[in-house]
Every structure is written in C-alpha cells, then in structure tokens.
Amino acid sequence: MLDEQTTKALIKKMFEKQDELNIHTNGSDWRNNKNLNWRRAIWTECAELLDYTNWKWWRQQDISMKDIEMELIDIWHFLMSDLMINNS
C-alpha cells in the first residue's frame, strides 16, 4: 500500500501527463475549447464499457476484462480532463 504522500505525487503526475496529452492532441488552448465535451466522452465510454459485459439478456456474451479495463482507462483520462477544466 502506498503512503498518502506517494499517492498524491502519483495522482499529480497523472494529471500533468494528461495535460501534456491534451496539449499534444488538442492544442495548447485545449482548456478553452468549448467543442471538447469531456462529460459526453465519459458517457460514451461508459456505454462502450457495457458492451463488454453480459448485460444483454437476449444474447450470450463473454465478459472481456481486458476491454473493460481499457474503457475504464479511457473514462479516467476524460474525467481528469474534465476535472482540470472545472476545478482549476
């Protein structure tokens, strides 16, 4: 288990890296781009995540933990972006 200081440092680093990624993909003014709807992106990823579970009672489907993990990572990226805009 990580101590609180290490955990905070790792989370801070994740947000810094997300900011770098957003600058690379969306430009240095990404925080002011009103066309980037992070919450819609989160909802979309949530819907995609459901497709990798067996929630559809009309169809037999295997659960894909690898794909679920990828969707959760995508959700985390979009959530960090939204938090950087709405909590700065």
Segments from the language model and where they lie:
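Flexible "arm" and connector segments at domain edges
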Residues: M1-S88
